[in-house]
Amino acid sequence: MNIALDAVNNKAFTQATEAYQKILDKGKENNSFYLPARKGILTCRYEQLRQSPAERSDYLQIAGNCEKYMQEFGYTPTNIDILSLLAELYAYRLQQPDSADRLLDKAIRIPRLNPNTLSQLKSQRADLLTFMDNPWEATILYTQLEKANPNNDIGYEAKLKKAMLAYYAGDLLWAKAQFDVLKGATSKLISNDAIQMSHFIHMNYEAEGDNRDLEKMGRTEYLLYKQQFQEVLPRLDSLIGHCSPGISDYATLQKARSLCACFQDEEAAKLLSELKDRSEQVYIKAEALFQLAGLKRKQKELQQAKELYRLLVTDYSGSVYSIEAAKLYRDLEAGEQTEVNNL
């Protein structure tokens, strides 16, 4: 089991699947690892498909296997992870969000769920409602989560997502006020997102002027959230072409994200490379570097990734990415040293 878990942690999903299969081959009897291995294979297969373009039939097969698992082992608190995976498949891979919503509603009603699990399911359902173009119901759920979790990351994340909904809707000053509160969140990821969004609005908001471009950017990001890429890309090109540098550069970052989501990594890398050299905004340059380094890691161009992380640490030490970049740089160095030792 440890071999499988180590492989998962290293994103070596093929090796993890093989290790899980060896556990399953031993059968159910006197095999305490049987259920974790059944779950692990489903999760690994899903993660494998997410790494590159996949056929709908592949996702249907995983969904069918998840359904089979639930029929065999029941809708119980111990199987919430597979229920959650199945809802994600229906919502975002199989274009059946109504089925996902019904499944999450059923999951939320399972007796004896612990409070954290219940909150995570409600958060997943609120995300789905946002995706289904129902921001009002999503906001209600996020507000409930925020009140039920006033001093933990679940509550902070709900507040962040509620602020993003306000940003999408063009309520810029209210959204910024929420982002400002979240700058001190205990989760570095939430804090970083809040800092960046607050800074973006602050730098581009015109108190006495026209904020239509900023509002267009928010609406376009909502389309990006809903994975409507055919509509998103021309809108981003329009914003890049005619907006001020603050919005144009930010739109370029979002275009790179869109291209990555469509598995057009080479085009995304080219955009990010140009942006890091062109932009005069430090936070934009830092984010472009961080995104580009992540792409280089994905493409196994590890020396280039390491150099980009080094630049973030040395030249952008005040950015929200510097600490994470230092950690990733050390990880890459450790990997190189391991290879040398194995020669």
Role assignments for model-derived ranges:
Residues 1-343:
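Acidic, polar-rich low-complexity tracts and alpha-helical solenoid repeat scaffolds
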